[in-house]
Design a protein with these regions (language model features):
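Phosphate-ester processing/binding pockets and catalytic centers
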Residues: 1-131
Length: 131
């Protein structure tokens, strides 16, 4: 039987700091090997003199955390390498995006997210049931 890995990540904290709240789902059919893509990505980083560090957009854009001391050019090159890797990898993704100012409360936002996530899962039900 095939196996599907689903990775879920969110971006945009609660409260007033971020304008948007994003919920991303990355789906990877484990029968589709990504090892060569990872090796190629790591080689590309090494050739360009870039560190192989986890990609986190907010710190990358602001030169915080693991990106401190990196120039804007280095951070742009890192993002370009990762983008190329992501485009070539055999996985798919879905992103739910919400403008936080459109909701009266965090509870309203979460209710909308829950409904949207249920609809998304039902839209993908046939595909998901194949695993």
């Amino acid at each position: 039987m095939r196996e599907l890995s689903v990775f879920v990540d969110e971006s945009g904290n609660l409260g007033d700091d971020a304008k948007y709240y994003l919920l991303a789902l990355v789906l990877h059919d484990q029968s589709k090997n990504i090892f060569e893509h990872i090796v190629r990505y790591e080689r590309t980083l090494a050739k360009r003199g870039l560190r192989d560090i986890p990609l986190h957009m907010n710190p990358l854009m602001r030169a915080n955390e693991g990106y401190k001391g990196m120039t804007t050019q280095e951070r742009n090159r890192l993002l370009t390498c990762f983008s190329s890797f992501a485009w070539k990898c055999p996985f798919s993704y879905e992103v739910l995006s919400y403008r936080k100012s459109h909701f009266k409360s965090d509870e309203d936002l979460f209710s909308k997210m829950k409904r949207d996530l249920i609809l998304l899962l039902f839209d993908k039900l046939e595909t998901l049931q194949a695993y």
